[in-house]
Design a protein with these regions (language model features):
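Catalytic alpha-helical scaffold of carbohydrate-active enzymes acting on polysaccharides/glycoconjugates
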Residues: 1-190
Length: 190
């Protein structure tokens, strides 16, 4: 199983969750030459019958439910007659809410809006020397937060660092209408 999150040109991607549409197309071209793409039905058949998968079997999936999955990835998958599984995080459907990792990225991307006093205090508190180290530290802390309440408390502190750009379209998740469009495609399994 090959996992993707996003197919988009965001210009800022410190976690490397995105692949550009051009690179996605090139990757699929390469993968088609060297791997045996299987669809969900084949995957389930091999899994449920304990039959060996074909050599170099490959199933693509997407996590999270970003709008670019429909707008950028799906047309490429359809053109290549490939199928992918899409796992949708439903909490952000039809909203302008950001995933916590996107919120962290956006705060650090918008460097001119960072509150330097808060930045200096956090750097000193955690014994770090630059914003990049702080970003990595906070990302790890958020990923390993033991509970949702611990993560939300940490996010509240992080929000004191800076503001989020008003254009959230690069991080937008699917709308209900777009989810139905995605589900209608033979190249998508949700």
């Amino acid at each position: 199983v090959l996992l993707y999150h996003r197919v988009a040109d965001t210009g800022y991607d410190p976690q490397q969750l995105c692949v550009s549409p051009e690179n996605f197309e090139k990757q699929l071209k390469y993968l088609k030459r060297h791997y045996h793409f299987i669809n969900v039905e084949e995957f389930n058949h091999h899994l449920n019958t304990n039959k060996a998968f074909p050599k170099n079997a490959l199933l693509i999936n997407f996590d999270d439910g970003y709008a670019d999955n429909l707008l950028n990835a799906l047309p490429i998958l359809e053109a290549k007659n490939l199928q992918s599984v899409f796992y949708i995080a439903t909490a952000n459907l039809n909203t302008n809410h950001l995933f916590w990792w996107d919120e962290l990225d956006e705060i650090f991307r918008n460097k001119e809006a960072i509150n330097n006093q808060v930045l200096i205090r956090l750097l000193k508190t955690y014994g770090l020397s630059n914003p990049e180290q702080l970003y990595a530290f906070l990302l790890t802390a958020l990923k390993t937060a033991g509970s949702l309440s611990v993560r939300n408390d940490l996010l509240e502190k992080i929000r004191q660092l800076g503001t989020i750009n008003s254009d959230l379209s690069p991080y937008r998740c699917l709308t209900y209408h777009e989810l139905k469009q995605l589900a209608a495609s033979r190249s998508a399994v949700i």
